[in-house]
């Protein structure tokens, strides 16, 4: 519980600013290997863990979902839109769609995390989980320009997929982006 509270307090803060979470979010390599700035991995893990802690909050049910299939942020936001249609015919008419689009259009990692934090807060209020391991991998890949479009496209595909698609296949279809140098 204390670790989760420390992680929550670090949401929106720079990697390394909260000593209580260093063992969770910092790489243990030499300064010569890692450099002065946070690594892509540190930024991705820090963001994913702190947003998970924010998302989990006081929810009794686990907000990290790895059951049956990976649930990207796009798929979780789709679930949020469909759970609160309020007379709308399409998920794209739900206000959360504009928030997802703002996150996808974010030009910097910092602005992406601000938009992601807003979406995660909404997911937490609705008790809709997402796969934070996948989210960390997506955030890592987003930071590599040659992989960014693939991550964004997958989030968009997962939002666009209808609940009927998921029911027919038994899972949402996800594409892994292979690691390459």
Segments the model singles out, each with a brief description of its role:
Residues 24-28, 66-76, 118-122, 136-142:
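Amphipathic alpha-helical scaffolding segments
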Residues 1-40, 47:
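N-terminal domain-start signal
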Residues 11, 15-16, 29-30, 50-58, ...:
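Short alpha-helix boundary/capping elements
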Residues 102-181:
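Elongated scaffolding segments in large macromolecular assemblies
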Residues 2-3, 19-23, 37, 61-66, ...:
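Short coil/turn segments at secondary-structure boundaries
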Residues 30-79:
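Aromatic- and glycine-enriched beta-alpha-beta binding-site module
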């Amino acid at each position: 519980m204390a670790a989760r509270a420390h992680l929550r307090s670090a949401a929106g803060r720079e990697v390394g600013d909260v000593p209580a979470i260093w063992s969770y979010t910092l790489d243990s390599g030499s300064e010569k290997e890692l450099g002065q700035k946070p690594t892509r991995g540190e930024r991705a893990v820090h963001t994913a863990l702190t947003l998970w802690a924010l998302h989990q909050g006081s929810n009794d049910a686990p907000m990290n979902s790895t059951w049956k299939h990976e649930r990207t942020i796009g798929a979780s936001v789709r679930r949020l839109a469909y759970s609160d249609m309020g007379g709308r015919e399409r998920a794209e008419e739900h206000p959360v769609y504009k928030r997802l689009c703002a996150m996808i259009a974010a030009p910097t990692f910092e602005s992406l995390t601000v938009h992601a934090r807003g979406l995660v807060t909404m997911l937490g209020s609705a008790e809709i989980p997402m796969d934070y391991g996948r989210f960390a991998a997506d955030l890592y890949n987003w930071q590599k320009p040659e992989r960014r479009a693939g991550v964004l496209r997958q989030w968009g595909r997962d939002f666009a997929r209808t609940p009927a698609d998921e029911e027919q296949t038994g899972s949402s279809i996800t594409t892994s982006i292979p690691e390459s140098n």
